[in-house]
Each structure stands twice: as structure tokens, then as C-alpha cells.
Amino acid sequence: MPQIDWKPRSRVVTDGIEATTSRGMLRAVGMGDADWEKPQIGIASSWNEITPCNLSLDRLAQGAKEGVHSGGGYPLQFGTVSVSDGISMGHEGMHFSLVSREVIADSVETVMMAERLDGTVLLAGCDKSLPGMLMAAARLDLSAIFLYAGSIAPGWVKLSDGTEKDVTIIDSFEAVGACKAGKMSEEDLKRIECAIAPGEGACGGMYTANTMASVAEALGMSLPGSAAPPSADRRRDSFAHRSGEAVVSLLKQGITARDILTKKAFENAIAVAMAFGGSTNVVLHLLAIAREAEVDLTIDDFNRIGETVPHIGDLKPFGTYVMNDVDRHGGVPVVMKALLDAGLLHGDCLTVTGKTVAENLAEIDPPAPDGTVLRSLDNPIHPTGGLTILKGTLAPEGAVVKTAGFDAEVFEGPARVFERERAAMDALTAGRINAGDVVVICYEGPKGGPGMREMLAITATIKGAGLGKDVLLLTDGRFSGGTTGLCIGHIAPEAVDAGPIAFVRDGDLIRVDIAARSLDLLVDESELTARRDGWAPLPPRYTRGVLAKYSKLVRSAAEGAVTG
């Protein structure tokens, strides 16, 4: 067996007289003669002070660095960007959210390649920073491990009528809708505002960040049990230290990201997301990560796996509980062990421990699902997975719906068509949207938006106005992980690419059938052909800057909205 070099890249900056200048630079940041034989580990962090999601990452990065030292490596920390969806929601800033995923992946690749670092610990806390980091790991194919910042504790509020309840960030969006509809006072709205974020950590439900953290653990890219503990929990410091040690161990064994990120690993990730009833954004992100790993994953794989995996997590936004409750009952390993025992998970997949999924779960020996937060597989919330891909005349390439929170098996109604989200929001707040309507928001796709904005503001307003079970919302944009109800997104092809959604007109009948997995525009093809005659897309919204570049490169949502 050939000897494994645990410094596969950094020798070019540490060895020989040609490395004199680079060694001199590295001496200035603390390295010395005793360090040249150590592998150099990039500690990539999306820490910032803009959002509570990332506040713990500076502390966790220090723990990871200590772990790297303990393992025999030398850590070198660097930062990347992160966008807060909670702050950027509902205005122009949301155009930049999904774009940040690509910026994060590109920036981590840039530093790792330029500085010839040997391996990396990747730390993130916000929705797009998690997949961005995992995309970078897959693209680089070095020894790598991911560590999540952890989720926030739920807030607590007492309203003016004496009602007391736990609240998350999603409650604030819905409260805005209720206030605008005259169903909540501004005083109670302020009370909710002051309660939703009591400290550090990512949004607490099974929204996008917690879905992706669970997925990272299921993929084998995070230490077992590391997804669920809250951000403020000191177990996270232990996971940080162990992650630093683990990446050095991976280097010693010659294990790289693509050894872990196999087709079976992605199937495990989909199964776990289905069981939890995770965010629709997981479809985009897993497709993108798989593409970076050169794994043949398609949008149809989600239905194939979802057919056999029950939905067992009673978690917000559609359920009762949050990630802290999952942690109290054993975390992600509980779900993985239940799926493994039922033959719904591949136990032979390699992980960052150097052991297989089955070996890790045997060591942890997690308890069975508690039956409340996490149901048993023979008593599920739904018999199939919490996400479904729809196809039909309105979405030939596909659309995504969170069936875990969808309140109708069949919905048929007349279209109310809007170009971009703002026009739809104005119509809703003016009372021009009625029960039974199908609100169609086009030109919000990856290219046409650009940036495929999340529609949490309008979905929460619909729910807050009491129309959540009576109005269907369709878009070529996407939804927040906190969205629930009659919402279907990721419609592809998008409007700017002459997808059928571009040719829907007010009054057209649209029908969705969840059991049949169909989404159809009930208009004769001859009429659609006539509408296409002389059609031209809306002009680009941005002609300079990152969004102009992005709109020229980005692919269909059905391919993960990737740019490469």
C-alpha cells in the first residue's frame, strides 16, 4: 500500500529553498520551524455580527483550531460571507440570498486553492452558508468536515389577551399579516418582535438551516450527533474540538470529501430530509452539492426515495416542535437508526469518523423515536416523505411542494397572475385576493429574478390574513424553510426561459393533484401557442454587479440553480 502524505498540497509553501518567501510570510502569522511538517488546515467560517445565526462561529472556530493542533496539524482561519434571510426577506435584499451560496463556495475554493491548504473545517450557521460550504468541500475533494453553529432557543411571549406561547422567527412574519388584516394589535406585534430571537443560533424549526445541518450529518460530512444541540450548548465546543482532530485523522487516512459524498450518501440525505419533513430548499442544495461531487443525482430521485420513507418529525413550521426538542430526544441519530433498521438507509456509507454510518450508529446506540416529537415509522404523520416533486403542463421540468404542510390533496382555481412578488403583495394587502384564487408569481426564478427569492413574506401574510387554506401560491421563485401551506415553488422552466408559467393569464384554471404529483395549466395548447407568438421576456433587472453575472450563468432550479 502506498504511503499517504498528510501534507498533499502545502509542501509547495513549506519545503525547499523555493518556499523561502512563503515560509517567511507564515512565520509572521505564528508558524515556525517545528510546524513545517504539519498539514495546514483551513478553518473556513461564515462568522459575522449581522445575524444571531453566526454569532457562535468565532468561538467554535477557536475550538476547531485547538482540535487541529491536538491532532498534529496547523490551523489557519479565514472568513467568508453570509446573508441573513431573516433580515433580507421581502425586499430587494432577497435577490442576493441564493447568490451568496455560490459566492461562499467560490470564496472557500479560492482561498484553499491559492494558499495550498491540505484540508478544511467548514463552519456555518445560516441557510445558504451551509450548502455553500458543502459545495466547496465537494468541489475541492480534500479532507474536510462540516460543523453547524446550532439553532436558537425558542422565544417566549405573553400577549395582551393573556395567551402565553413559544415563538420563532416565523411567528413574526405571520403576525405582520395578522396585524395588517386587523387581527392583531401593534402592541402584540411588538411583543412578538422582542421575543423571537432570544440569543445566538439559527432559526429553531425544521427550516432550511436545520434541514441542511441534518442533511450534512446524514451525508457523513459532520460528526454523528452534531446537528441538533443548540448553539449555546457547550457540547458544541466539544464537537468543534473533535472536528479539528477528525480532519487531521482524515488526512492521515487519505479520506477526501468525495470518498464520503457518494450516490448512496445523497440517498441517505434525502431519506433523512423526507423523514423530518424538511425545507423545500434541500432539493436545490442537494442537487448543487451532488453536481460539485460529480454524483448523478436528479430531481426525480426525491420522489423515488420519498415514496418509501414516512414523514415522522412533528416539527415547525407545520408541526409543534423545534430542533431543541429533537436534541432532547436523541438528535438526528434517532431518525437515522430508525431508517437503518427499516432498511431505508445505506449503512455502509463512509463518514468523517473514518467509520461507516452503521458503525457510528452502533457506537451511539440512540433511543427509539419518542413517539411525539419523532413518531415511529409504523405510526407516521404521513406515510410518505414530506417533500414531493410535481410535474405537468405548468412545470414540465418539475416543481417542489412541501406536502408535510400542504392542506389539500387537490386544488383547482382561477389564476391571479403577477410579475414579481411586490405586485402580488400589494394586491393581497389591498384585499384583492380571494379564497379559491391561485396566485401565480412569475419572473422570480434563478435567472429572471434574479436570485430566486424566497416568498416567506407573502406566504406568511396570506396565512396571517386567514387565507392559508384557501389560496394557492405558485412561483418560479422559492420559499423559505419556514413556509407551510398551499405553496408550490421552483417551477421550471422559469418565466424568463419561456416556461409555461410565462404564459398564464388571469382567469386560467390551474389544477394541482398531490397524489398524482401533477401541476397542470388547463389551457388548450393552441391557445398557449398563440400567446407565445411575439413573446419576449422582461428585460434584465440588473445589468451590473454580481446579480448581472449570476443571471448569465445560473441554470434551472431543476438542476439546483448552479452556476458552473
From Swiss-Prot:
It comes from the Bacteria. Its EC number is 4.2.1.9. The active site is at S480. It catalyses: (2R)-2,3-dihydroxy-3-methylbutanoate = 3-methyl-2-oxobutanoate + H2O; (2R,3R)-2,3-dihydroxy-3-methylpentanoate = (S)-3-methyl-2-oxopentanoate + H2O. PROSITE patterns: ILVD_EDD_1, ILVD_EDD_2. GO terms for molecular function: 2 iron, 2 sulfur cluster binding; dihydroxy-acid dehydratase activity; magnesium ion binding. SUPFAM superfamilies: IlvD/EDD N-terminal domain-like, LeuD/IlvD-like. Signal peptide: none annotated. The keyword Repressor does not apply. Mg(2+) binds at D85, D127, K128, E454. Pathway: Amino-acid biosynthesis; L-isoleucine biosynthesis; L-isoleucine from 2-oxobutanoate: step 3/4; Amino-acid biosynthesis; L-valine biosynthesis; L-valine from pyruvate: step 3/4. Pfam families: ILV_EDD_C (PF24877), ILVD_EDD_N (PF00920). Keywords: 2Fe-2S, Amino-acid biosynthesis, Branched-chain amino acid biosynthesis, Iron, Iron-sulfur, Lyase, Magnesium, Metal-binding. The modification N6-carboxylysine is found at K128. InterPro entries: DHAD_IlvD/Edd, Dihydro-acid_dehy_C, DihydroxyA_deHydtase, DiOHA_6PGluconate_deHydtase_CS, ILV_EDD_C, ILV_EDD_N, IlvD/EDD_N. One of its GO terms (biological process) is L-valine biosynthetic process. Its cofactor is [2Fe-2S] cluster; Mg(2+). Belongs to the IlvD/Edd family. PANTHER family: DIHYDROXY-ACID DEHYDRATASE DAD (PTHR21000), DIHYDROXY-ACID DEHYDRATASE, MITOCHONDRIAL (PTHR21000:SF5). Functions in the biosynthesis of branched-chain amino acids. Catalyzes the dehydration of (2R,3R)-2,3-dihydroxy-3-methylpentanoate (2,3-dihydroxy-3-methylvalerate) into 2-oxo-3-methylpentanoate (2-oxo-3-methylvalerate) and of (2R)-2,3-dihydroxy-3-methylbutanoate (2,3-dihydroxyisovalerate) into 2-oxo-3-methylbutanoate (2-oxoisovalerate), the penultimate precursor to L-isoleucine and L-valine, respectively. Homodimer. This is Dihydroxy-acid dehydratase. It comes from Leifsonia xyli subsp. xyli (strain CTCB07). The lineage of its organism: Bacteria, Bacillati, Actinomycetota, Actinomycetes, Micrococcales.
